[in-house]
A protein has these predicted regions:
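Canonical positions in the second alpha-helix
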Residues: 26-27, 60-61, 99-100, 139-140, ...
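Alpha-helical segment of the N-proximal tetratricopeptide repeat
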Residues: 1-36, 40-47, 74-91, 119-126
């Protein structure tokens, strides 16, 4: 049995995930509750992109070995890092992180505690809970002070919280130890862009793109008139029940969100937001309140162009963003919009 497990491990390490899966399933035919084989099976399914099957496989593994730190970490990583924009999956992964963190503390396993704290910080950043993410990431760095992964993720949290000077210092610190870290260059480009340093922003973006072109494709750029036309088409395509709310609502396009827009809420809005609704939702307005500002919707062209990978995707996202902000105008919150697929 040990030799067969070693063969599965060798296949997995060599990147032959089909062979690793076949070997793990062969082991499970003889020993259905062998934790190591269950773990290899689930992990191989992840690497093969069969995520739904992987989720079930991790469930089986955790049923057999509910306190196995390695299985818990792999299952949490699958949910946090591989599930894309699935907030429910990320939330489930965060629950596994909390469980693993407690078990690692109990076992005095510093390395695994660090891993769970780092993954927790990543998941919290994805959920937009960046202040809480900072707590986890600072704790992770308390155990592994030189961790570049934790430093980068901490810089991202600071950026999302609009603490731009601190984020800049964090990413510059990363580059001292890892001059070719693409995410540090990318975020330093975003920070330079916000302060109007176009030359520095371009240099940073070009560097990040050269390092990992698949992560940072060139933005899909539209001329001003073409972008405005796409916005007009998006408004025309709105359902009739939504259009009725747009009387006396200004729809505008700006390059990037201002500090005023971002810091007008607590916690602040993400600097990467695609659009924003300014004003009071229709259901909350009062004819007695003379101080209510006129309602407006703003789309942020550079963020939208960076978000999309093709012209078609950009046009589609403009439509989704317009509908999203009209949803806020109608009084829907982020959870309502997420349930409607408009997040």
């Amino acid at each position: 049995m040990e030799a067969r497990l070693d063969a599965v491990a060798d296949a997995f390490e060599a990147g032959d995930f089909e062979a690793a899966l076949a070997g793990a399933e062969g082991l499970l035919a003889d020993a259905p509750e062998l934790p190591e084989a269950l773990h290899f099976r689930a992990s191989a399914l992840v690497e093969l992109g069969r995520l739904e099957e992987a989720g079930k496989a991790f469930g089986q593994a955790l049923k057999v070995a509910p306190e196995d730190l390695e299985i818990l970490l792999s299952a949490a990583d699958c949910l946090v890092c591989r599930a894309g924009e699935d907030r429910e999956a990320v939330a489930e992964g965060l629950a596994l992180c909390a469980r693993g963190r407690r078990l690692a503390q109990k076992a005095d396993d510093v390395e695994m505690l660090y891993e769970f704290l780092l993954l927790e910080g990543m998941g919290l950043n994805q959920m937009g809970e960046c202040a809480t993410a900072l707590v986890s990431l600072d704790a992770a760095l308390g155990h592994m002070p030189r961790s570049l992964d934790a430093q980068v993720e901490r810089g991202i949290a600071l950026f999302e919280l609009c603490r731009f000077d601190e984020a800049k210092a964090a990413f510059e610190k990363v580059l001292k130890d890892a001059p070719d870290d693409p995410w540090a260059h990318h975020y330093l480009g975003l920070i330079a862009e916000r302060r109007g340093d176009e030359k520095e922003a371009k240099r940073r973006f070009d560097k990040a793109r050269a390092l990992v072109p698949e992560e940072f494709p060139p933005p899909v750029e539209l001329a001003e008139a073409e972008f405005d036309r796409a916005v007009e088409d998006a408004v025309k395509s709105l359902p009739r029940h939504a259009k009725q709310y747009l009387d006396n609502v200004t729809i505008a396009v700006e390059d990037l969100p201002s500090d005023e827009d971002l810091l007008g809420q607590d916690p602040p809005l993400s600097p990467s937001i695609l659009g924003v609704f300014r004003g009071t939702p229709v259901g909350e307005r009062s004819v007695m309140n003379a101080y209510e500002l006129p309602a407006s919707i703003v789309l942020y062209q550079r963020n939208l162009e960076r978000f999309a990978r093709t012209r078609e995707e950009l046009i589609e996202q403009i439509g989704i963003t317009v509908m999203h902000e009209v949803g806020h105008l109608m009084g829907l919150d982020e959870d309502d919009l997420w349930q409607r697929g408009l997040d």
